[in-house]
């Protein structure tokens, strides 16, 4: 019934107009699973490798025909006839077939597309939603959204050094209400920026990209927008940051171009602590650079009991890097990006390891996205309680929010919104 009879890869476009891989997996009973693979702009040095063609005459070298060829050729040859419900074995076969530590031969984009499409095909065959197929009967927690409403760094053409300024509606009673609260703040912020002469065009992830010079200036605008929308900062809606510090860590210092200032490792950790003291910031992602292990240890000791410290480039959804971080006291949370590691099995293993260590997990999109909403289902399947999938603009972002609305409606009275409990491990929310 669930035997794989065909795997079809193709080249499609992501939200930035760059090629990416989409895969259909067809089963013997006619069930079809489809998955499209995202792509990042600020990528960690230790991520699994997405395979690009390198042909400068085509998409400036960013084509993915080699990855598509791997899907339609080697990977299908290896997986044809297998049962789609054998997810772990299927993923292990693809990892072995690739034969490299970072999936660089076949491409993580090829392998992930197949891995996710297999799971979706199996779910379709069993007539189950993906979140239920992957997560079982306990999958019913709707995540708190981290909504990226001001963009900076490599996600926007402006002077702000930090990459993302986010709001988290922790005080909402349901996911649908959290979405409404976030949308109201988003539109209030847009009006405030417009009225003060700022550009209200949006960046890669749907947030505004005004010409502000510092994190303080961006946070002040957001605080005012929360209040103008009728909410209490820190009680109804909290703040979250993604500095993406690896992008501006140079020769042992954090170089703030917008502020025309450099901070050493000690100063960077103290600066983040100061921001947490001045604003209701409950989560900071990549506050230190990916290989600044001493900096990570410092900031974790300094504010780890007051703030969720999320490792993205630090961990790259990799159990080996996560295990090392846990042993050495780096961070207290992991960002989960399926394309950083390249298979569903490895993604779920990273989440499980985080949970066992008392770390939180945040399901995440990439800046180059598609209409694929798989991560919405995976957030519910894993009961991770938090999702980061952009702003309240651009269909590639709202596709995930809309899928979560559907899931909440489908679950009905069984649905549970994570709310403040998503961050219950940290005393500032007790």
From Swiss-Prot:
Reaction catalyzed: (2R)-2-phosphoglycerate = phosphoenolpyruvate + H2O
Q: Which residues bind Mg(2+)?
A: 242, 285, 312
Q: How is the cofactor bound?
A: Binds a second Mg(2+) ion via substrate during catalysis.
- Annotated Gene Ontology MF terms? magnesium ion binding; phosphopyruvate hydratase activity
UniProt cross-references to InterPro entries, sorted A to Z:
Enolase, Enolase-like_C_sf, Enolase-like_N, Enolase_C, Enolase_CS, Enolase_N
Which residue positions are annotated as catalytic?
Answer: 205 (proton donor), 337 (proton acceptor)
- BP-aspect Gene Ontology terms: glycolytic process
> Where along the chain is (2R)-2-phosphoglycerate bound?
163, 337, 366-367, 388
The subcellular location is: Cytoplasm; Secreted; Cell surface
Alphabetical UniProt keywords: Cytoplasm, Glycolysis, Lyase, Magnesium, Metal-binding, Secreted
Question: Which cofactor is essential here?
Answer: Mg(2+)
Gene Ontology CC annotations of this record: cell surface; extracellular region; phosphopyruvate hydratase complex
Q: In which pathway does it act?
A: Carbohydrate degradation; glycolysis; pyruvate from D-glyceraldehyde 3-phosphate: step 4/5
Q: What is its EC number?
A: 4.2.1.11
Chief location: cytoplasm
The EC category is lyase
Per the record, the similarity remark reads: Belongs to the enolase family.
UniProt-listed PANTHER family: ENOLASE
Its annotated function is as follows: Catalyzes the reversible conversion of 2-phosphoglycerate (2-PG) into phosphoenolpyruvate (PEP). It is essential for the degradation of carbohydrates via glycolysis.
Name the chain's protein: Enolase
Q: What organism is this sequence from?
A: Rhodopseudomonas palustris (strain BisB18)
Query: Lineage, please?
Result: Bacteria, Pseudomonadati, Pseudomonadota, Alphaproteobacteria, Hyphomicrobiales
Task: Name the gene.
Answer: eno
